[in-house]
Amino acid sequence: MKVVEVKHPLIRHKVGLMREADISTKRFRELATEVGSLLTYEATSDFETEKVTIEGWNGPVEIDQIKGKKVTVVPILRAGLGMMDGVLEHIPSARISVVGIYRDEETLEPVPYFEKIVSNVEERIALVVDPMLATGGSMIATIDLLKSKGCTSIKALVLVAAPEGIAALEKAHPDIELYTASIDKCLNEQGYILPGLGDAGDKIFGTK
């Protein structure tokens, strides 16, 4: 599995700000969008382009345009919604697929409760977004679902990842790509990432 920890100074700075215990909902939400945008820039760097001639202000001009598969953004509810706008800044025409999964706080296992996947997902590149890759259960379950519907081009974008989650994801789906703003130290006994960001969903939605 291709794992990319994006170490750009802007990303490192912004993720650092997100770790503050008393960060406001507004600020956390803004930073999640900004880092999501920067991760999208990196994750799409291998998209193929083709030459197209258009009519410019002074006559015909040859330009580069993205070619190949179109994109579907797949936020994992609910926290993934906090990164979605950052992706759409760069790919505003992307279709949106939604997967609802929550983690059982006792077993740490993923529990699916909703899905709405675009009908032609097998023809698209799926960018799955979720702020935290902890145990990896929710991400694995989402990718299982996408593959069951024929999607073969999948990239996962997360703000913070634990080594345990990366290992689990690689074991389950070695053919996907993972882009993260930070690979953190470990999981604690409750399955939370250390040092992590806290509960990203609560911080994005103001329910902490």
UniProtKB/Swiss-Prot annotation:
SUPFAM superfamilies: PRTase-like (SSF53271). Pfam families: UPRTase. Uracil binds at residues 193, 198-200. Keywords: Allosteric enzyme, Glycosyltransferase, GTP-binding, Magnesium, Nucleotide-binding, Transferase. One of its GO terms (molecular function) is uracil phosphoribosyltransferase activity. Its EC number is 2.4.2.9. Its cofactor is Mg(2+). It catalyses: UMP + diphosphate = 5-phospho-alpha-D-ribose 1-diphosphate + uracil. GO terms for biological process: UMP salvage; uracil salvage. Pathway: Pyrimidine metabolism; UMP biosynthesis via salvage pathway; UMP from uracil: step 1/1. InterPro entries: PRibTrfase_dom, PRTase-like, Upp_B, UPRTase/APRTase, Ura_phspho_trans. Allosterically activated by GTP. 5-phospho-alpha-D-ribose 1-diphosphate binds at residues 78, 103, 130-138, 199. Gene3D superfamilies: 3.40.50.2020. Binds 1 Mg(2+) ion per subunit. The magnesium is bound as Mg-PRPP. Catalyzes the conversion of uracil and 5-phospho-alpha-D-ribose 1-diphosphate (PRPP) to UMP and diphosphate. Belongs to the UPRTase family. HAMAP family: Upp_B. This is Uracil phosphoribosyltransferase. The gene is upp.
